[in-house]
Design a protein with these regions (language model features):
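A Zn2+-metalloprotease active-site environment signal
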Residues: 2-254
Length: 254
């Protein structure tokens, strides 16, 4: 798979564990190179530990940060995020770190090492508690092991198709072409209704623990529904529409 094929494949799905569908512009951050740098030596899927996942996630997050336009510490976006995440460097044993990518795209993603990245386009349209819902949702993806599951699935498929790992070796050097194929599998594997619901449920519980306005979870999804044409019917069939998710969360708020 060449670079053009990879970007075309990714143009219909979000990068990493994104909460919303990203456009090609948001994804075209040299993903092939990112994975090549981050995962030169990847353990077999069967032996992938939590420590392995966190290590690779950290490298990949670092690459993304270098390639993206990160809001500087003194900027309005960074200051707002600092206020919003005050006291949120850790949640239920999960150590977290935050940054804002300056882009018009409406998106957010999390990685297994506790990396959470918000896009400035998302912050522009959401209230403080709506952003906290997004943060809680991304925490949910990490806490529920969705990121680890995606990587294991992708590694298993790549190892099978490309024979990247021998039976006697723990690590295998993966070519960028294999990594590109693996990245497509990673982002496609994440879009299960079960995963999204678990992340939404975690977000609601997180907001309750922190005494944030839980109704903001519903209003955030309703905003996204309007942006996607009233239900996101063009999303992948395995990705619940924001309208459906908002309606489901309403039933849980008393």
């Amino acid at each position: 798979m060449n670079r053009r094929q990879l970007l075309l494949s990714l143009s219909v799905v979000p990068a990493t564990v994104a909460l919303y569908v990203a456009s090609p512009a948001a994804i075209a951050l040299d993903l092939g190179g990112m994975l090549g740098a981050a995962a030169g030596d990847i353990v077999k899927a069967a032996s992938l530990t939590d420590q392995d996942v966190r290590a690779y996630a950290s490298q990949m997050a670092g690459y993304m940060d270098r390639k993206a336009s990160v809001a500087p510490a003194g900027s309005g976006y960074a200051k707002r995020l600092s206020v919003l995440t005050s006291g949120l460097s850790e949640d239920q044993g999960l150590r977290l770190n935050y940054k804002v990518y300056v882009t018009k795209e409406i998106n957010a993603f999390a990685m297994a090492d506790g990396t959470i990245r918000l896009y400035s386009g998302l912050m522009d349209i959401m209230t403080d508690d709506e952003i906290r819902y997004v943060i809680g949702h991304e925490m949910g993806h990490v806490k529920n092991g969705h990121t680890k599951q995606r990587m294991q699935t992708a590694l298993a498929a790549s190892a099978t198709q490309k024979a990247v790992a021998s039976s006697g070796a723990k690590h295998a050097n993966l070519a960028d072409s294999v990594l590109g194929d693996m990245m497509v599998k990673v982002v496609r594997a994440q879009h299960s209704q079960g995963n999204e619901r678990e992340a939404d449920d975690y977000a609601l519980q997180f907001m309750g623990r922190r005494r944030y306005d839980r109704k903001a979870a519903v209003s955030a999804l309703e905003k996204l529904a309007k942006l996607s044409g009233g239900g996101g019917s063009n999303w992948l069939s395995t990705h619940p529409s924001p309208t459906e998710r908002a309606a489901r969360l309403k039933t849980q708020i008393v």
